[in-house]
């Protein structure tokens, strides 16, 4: 897909470097949408009788055991459909990419490592579950799909077969 997008972008007049960046962005978007679809289209999804819809896999901080499962219509317009999942990812990208007029800085920093350039500012996004939630184990569900779809675009992020567990 990426090569087709790059070829089409170059054919539309984009310089080679911009066509390659555009193709990378499109492939990344598609991979994120596929990950979202996988969350709603697997054998561990349940049916919510109150909402009348398929519920995604991660309703809690663990992969549940289910006795029966619900299937989403991937070709439809409801929860779990390609159109819905890709639309959700597109909405997220729009929010992230919309300029706020303020300078923002986002970094991934290992909480166990000293890093003094924040000068007294503390931002924590991890709830206080400590070892109760195995984030790395849960991340494997999405990681394996992303590794297969965009692992070659981001080799530093996907150099291991599964999410590294030691840092957790």
What positions do the PLM features span?
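Hydrophobic residues in beta-strands of the RecA-like P-loop NTPase core, especially within AAA+ ATPase
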Residues: 124-125
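Nucleic-acid modification enzymes, centered on SAM-dependent nucleic-acid methyltransferases
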Residues: 1-121, 133-168
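Switch II (G3) loop of P-loop NTPases
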Residues: 128
